[in-house]
Amino acid sequence: MIRPSAPAHRPGRGRPSRRCGDPPPARLRQGIDEFNRGQFFEQHETLELEWIEEPDPVRYLYQGILQVGVGFEHLRRGNAYGARRLWRRGIGYLEPFRGGCMGVDVDRLIADTERCLAELERVGDSGLERFDGSLIPRVEWLAGSD
């Protein structure tokens, strides 16, 4: 895998992107469809391609969605630590895009992921079989964006 050089922009600092008003690229739509079908490994592969190729800070939107999804793959595999770490990191990447970006309802994804963090804390690392799977979010589109 090719790793891009470190960008000047870091999540949580400055404006998220001048491109947030643009329509979502095809791979973002595909990755979100995969996320929403519970295909978390596949969404990682799809969104990683978009993230690597994107020079604009909107790449952190892709990275945030990607990491939240990979967190659910970790949960599925019984790795509570990995799930927690990736959800928190993903939320950090998504924070600058609150209010929505490229039609993605970022606020809802953050809130839903935070509910999953709280549920994971409730059941504990050794109680993953009690995790309420109905809390696993979908990435939703803002009204008029789908």
Annotate the PLM regions.
Residues G21, R59-L61:
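Residue signature of alpha-solenoid helical repeat architecture, marking inter-repeat boundaries
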Residues F41, R59, Y81-R85:
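Short, solvent-exposed positions on alpha-helices
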Residues A80-R98:
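TPR/TPR-like (Sel1-like) alpha-helical repeat modules
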Residues Q63-I65, G78-N79:
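Short Lys/Arg-rich amphipathic alpha-helical segments
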Residues M1-E54, Y93-D146:
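N-terminal alpha-helical interaction modules that lie
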